[in-house]
Structures are given as C-alpha cells and as structure tokens.
Amino acid sequence: MGNSWMLLALLVLLDPAHGTATHFSTSCNSLAKHASAFKSLNTTITNSTFFPAPANNVPAHAPTLCQPTTVITVPLCRIQFIVKTSDISAITAEIWIPTHYTGRSLSLGNGGLAGCIDYDNLAYGSSKGFAAIASNNGHDGQSGAPFLNNSQILADYITRSVHIETLAGKAIVQELVGSQPSRSYYSGCSTGGRQAFYSAFHFPDNFDGIIAGAPGTDWNNLLGAFGLWESFFGATTNNASIIDEAGWALVANEKLKQCDELDGVRDGIITEGEGCDFRPEELQCPEGLGTGSPTTCLSRNQVTALKLLYNPIYGLHGEYLFPSHNVASTNSSTLSTLFNGQIFQPTEDWVKYVVKGPNFNFSEYGVQTIEQMNALNPDNIATFDGDLTPFRKKGGKVIQYHGQADPLIPPAGSKLFYNQQAFNLGLKSFQLDEFYRLFLIAGMTHCTGGLGSTNFGQDGTAIPSNPAASNVLDDIVNWVENGIAPDTIIGASDDGKSLRAHCRYPQRSVLDGTNFVCTTAENT
C-alpha cells in the first residue's frame, strides 16, 4: 500500500493536468545548480534539459566514436553527468526521467568493449516510465586502447560503471522528484549480460530485477575462443582455409539439410545447435577437384577448419575450456564476416592492451594465450563462478535469455553458466525457478534479430507488434512486484503474424502437431 500511495503522489507531481509540469521542467533545467547534493558521490551534472515533446536529432555523447545523435520519444528530463572514479578516470552517464515516471529505475548495460552510451534503450526504458540510466563505462568508443597501463579505466569497465551510475542516478531521481526509486531494475545484453551477473554477484542490493541477455560470462575463455577460431581460418598463419560467403552459404545449407528437422519441422531454423551432430566432411571436394565458382564443395583445409570450429576447446592439459562455435548459426554473411582471416577485434584489443602488450605477434597465439588470459582475469571479469545467494535472499529475480542461433556467444555457454549456479547453490531447477530463469530463443541471433519469432521487448529495436507476445520488461516487473513469474517467453515475428513460445531451460521446445510446446527431457 505504501508504494502505491508513493507512486500516486509521483504521478500527480508529474501530471500536466495538475499544473505541475512547469514545476517539473523548471526543476529539471536548474538541476545542475544543485552541486552539493551530489558531492559525496563525486558526481557533477554537466547539463539538464527538459524536453516537453518528442525530439529528433538530439546531440549524443562522443558523436565521432559512437552515434552522433539520438531520439527522444516522450516528454522527459535529460540529465547528463560525470562521476569521478579516481584521479585519472571518470564515467560519463545520462539519466532520462519521463514525465510519466512510475517510480522505477532501469540501469542499462553495454556491448563489446563497451564505450558508448546506449541511447536506444534510454529512449525505450523512459518510454515505459522508467528513469533510465546508462553510461560509457569509463571510456569512449569500442577500442580497448584506453585500458593499456590504466587499471582505473579497466576497473570502470569491469566492475564500477554500472554500480556507480546506478547509485548516482538514484540520487539524481531523489533530488528531482523527492524520493529514490521504489524499485530498481537492470537490462543488458552481451557485455551487458555479463554486467548483469557481475552486479548480482558483487552488488546484490542494487537491483530488484535483472534481465541478462546472451551474457558474455566466462569472459576470458569466450574472447580466447574467438582468437583460436579465427586462427583456424588463417588469421594467424595463412588464408588457405578462409571460406567466402558463397562457401558459408554452402555450409549453412548442409547444416539445415542435416539438422533442421530435428525439432520436427523443416522451417529454416535449427532449434538447438547442440543436438546437431554436424558433419562438414559431407562438403569436401572429391580428390583433385577444387572449390571452383560457384562454390559446390570445400577444400580439405576448409573442412578441417570447420571440424575444429565445431568442436569444444580444451586446455594444454586436456581440461575443458569452452564450447564449440554455435552450429545453429546459419547466416552466411555474418559467418563470412566473422571468420575472414582477421582476429576478432575485441579479442585482439583485449590481448594487446590488457594481457600481452601492444606489440604481441598473433602468430604466437594459441591455447597457451587463453590460459594466460584466465590466469590474469582482472577484477574477476570472468564472471562465471560467483555466488547468487545474497541476491536470492533479498528477493531479487533474474530473467536470462539467449538466442539459439547466436553467432557471437554460444548459447551452450548460458547453459553452462546456469548449471554452474545450480551447483554453487545446491539447487535443483524447480528451486532455481523461484528466482532465476533461463529462456532459450529459437532462431534468434545475438541479442535480437534472426529467423522466426524473436521479438519480445528485450530491446528498443525488438518491440513486438503483436499484443499477444511477451514483453520481458513487463515480465520482470510483474515477477518482482506481483510474484508472477513467466513460464515461457512468447516471441513475435517481425511482421507480428507469427508467435512462438520459447522454453525455460532445462525444458525443450518440441513440435506437437502444429505448435511448439515445452517439455522436460523425460517426456521427449
């Protein structure tokens, strides 16, 4: 009841019909003058502007390194601020507080090497009534060069940014509307997914509900695996095994030929790549026949590279390090771009600027490099073997999702992470379900997009047009505030005409007549 009355008071405060819109806009525009309110948080407001209506082409931070402009979709107060984290480091952040603010905050993560403010989801979160918060994670752009010989900027990226932007953002909300958010949420994918679990492990009081998409957990092995995968296709030696887009189209068609119908229907989607025992040997050219043009078969070197790609990675002493690349990833354009004879940029930068030094010769890259990455593991960026007990005890909830066709982070990694948490906590799946659920999204690539029904409100670019579909932001709020957990995630196709229920792990998606249903392994 207390929260309901507080939210009602906030809505009255911000409702133009009650004559308070002018007060809100005045308070917003003068917020930068309230320096003393944020001194203890080392926070300086650099600009605060009230937007009475939607606006296009709004200047963004770091326009030459990230996006030049952004869009504001609802009336709101845009506050830009800097948090000093040391004598040589700082986080640049923004919080957008809409006039229809609901008393909830939404902190946002980032992607890749994470130096760009997520404006798309600032707009999305604020449009749904959240005070939306995002930062540049302590550096601008996607390069890892700022990490070189600077442990403070590295610490901002790994551990401090989400925590600090959230604390500062909540303080700004309190200064503007009179009280801190009644509920706090987080949403991020990829690096943002890793940040989600890092927050749950290390700062369990920050958030009531967390959405973690395709998390880049097991970070060192993930980036390390990409370096090794690239080496199979000539990135560190020669280009004899590079496969062009036409060749990857051949590979994709063979994958579908061998594995599409494993889920009971031929629809161009491999529902679960781990269930596909893909045999690239079927594509090898007969003795003495080259690949030719158009590509009709692959060379022995190319098939060998594929066999390595689709097998797990093991350490120097035979220990398991990381899953294979995702067999269910079939987009030939994406695959030809990824495995083009060049080292994956995040891997290259991490090795050069954090692990080995800028003069490292990648011809020396190998499993031993991955083991060095694991040994270094600054600030435990691996984010794999943590403890969710404090987050669970405080009543926190987690929705994790992962595209089954993800070409960047294998969905097998999310299963391994989930099972590691079950082991750490000593819980069975039905017990984990009480606070933590993992959903595997058939056909979806990295975070959004792909084939089939992959839109469920996980991102500002993936808002479903069919009202029968799920919205994962609504789902996490409903779980935290009403105790109603999602049994499935219902995704919608881009045109909204097709829906599909995506299952929570360890259930599996199985065709039952004309519809997919979720079933446990013993029932399949």
What do the predicted segments below correspond to?
Residues G112-G178, G224-A225, N359-T369, P378, ...:
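Cap/lid segment of the alpha/beta-hydrolase catalytic domain
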Residues M1-A21:
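Fungal secretory targeting signals
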Residues Q400-H402:
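Short beta-strand/loop motif that positions the catalytic acidic residue
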Residues L14-T102, Y119-D120, V265-R266, I270, ...:
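Catalytic-loop region of hydrolases
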Residues Y198-A200, D205-L316, T454-S470, D474:
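A catalytic-pocket lid/entrance helix-loop region that shapes and gates access to the active site
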Residues R78-H163, S190, F201, E230-A235, ...:
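N-terminal cap/lid subdomain of alpha/beta-hydrolase-fold enzymes
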Residues L408-A412:
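Conserved alpha/beta-hydrolase "acid-adjacent" motif
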Residues G188-G192, A196:
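Gly/Ala-rich beta-loop-alpha elbow adjacent to hydrolase catalytic centers
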